[in-house]
Amino acid sequence: MAALVEPLGLERDVSRAVELLERLQRSGELPPQKLQALQRVLQSRFCSAIREVYEQLYDTLDITGSAEIRAHATAKATVAAFTASEGHAHPRVVELPKTDEGLGFNIMGGKEQNSPIYISRVIPGGVADRHGGLKRGDQLLSVNGVSVEGEQHEKAVELLKAAQGSVKLVVRYTPRVLEEMEARFEKMRSARRRQQHQSYSSLESRG
């Protein structure tokens, strides 16, 4: 069981770094071009995505040891998450409240179907739809810090059902893969329907 840790507040630290860069620019002690470039990086959406994923993993990874060990393990897990998303949209964190009406989205896929787990539908007017942030075509990477990559469909369902109060999802947007997966499933369903029809026709001819 992981030791209790204080939640990270990296957004505050990034803001302080930006303020420091602004002071350095005003002082004229360092080349302003380099300071401005670093400031743009810290204020970019990419940096925000890294910070959100790092904070979420830091708060939920089951790691014992010093703060330094925890930070190192979290950094490795964050790099792994972004490396896995290479060529796709970067991971992002979506937090939704857990209420009696459910989370308001459906998932499909899983190890048993030889595919990632995806958000296949965001229910109009549901919790996910009202809070925004989650899209059809998002691949589900983890639920409350537990990875569901390469896992059975049922594991993701169980994690979502077990969540209390709220649920933190790490997702990345890869709609093309979902479309390919749905096309493959539809092809399999069509093949089964044809097979059933042929079997029924064969029985009729014998009768």
Swiss-Prot record:
Residues 10-65 form the L27 domain. Pfam families: L27, PDZ. A motif (Kinase interacting site) lies at residues 1-13. GO terms for biological process: exocytosis; neurotransmitter secretion; protein transport; regulation of synaptic assembly at neuromuscular junction; synaptic vesicle transport. This is Protein lin-7 homolog B. InterPro entries: L27_C (IPR014775), L27_dom (IPR004172), L27_dom_sf (IPR036892), LIN7 (IPR017365), MAM_complex_regulator (IPR051109), PDZ (IPR001478), PDZ_sf (IPR036034). GO terms for cellular component: basolateral plasma membrane; bicellular tight junction; cell-cell junction; MPP7-DLG1-LIN7 complex; plasma membrane; postsynaptic density membrane; presynapse; synapse. Plays a role in establishing and maintaining the asymmetric distribution of channels and receptors at the plasma membrane of polarized cells. Forms membrane-associated multiprotein complexes that may regulate delivery and recycling of proteins to the correct membrane domains. The tripartite complex composed of LIN7 (LIN7A, LIN7B or LIN7C), CASK and APBA1 associates with the motor protein KIF17 to transport vesicles containing N-methyl-D-aspartate (NMDA) receptor subunit NR2B along microtubules. Residues 187-207 are annotated as: Disordered. It comes from the Eukaryota. The keyword Cell membrane applies. GO terms for molecular function: protein domain specific binding; protein-macromolecule adaptor activity. It comes from Homo sapiens (Human). It is a peripheral membrane protein. Residues 197-207 have a biased composition (Polar residues). Residues 93-175 form the PDZ domain.
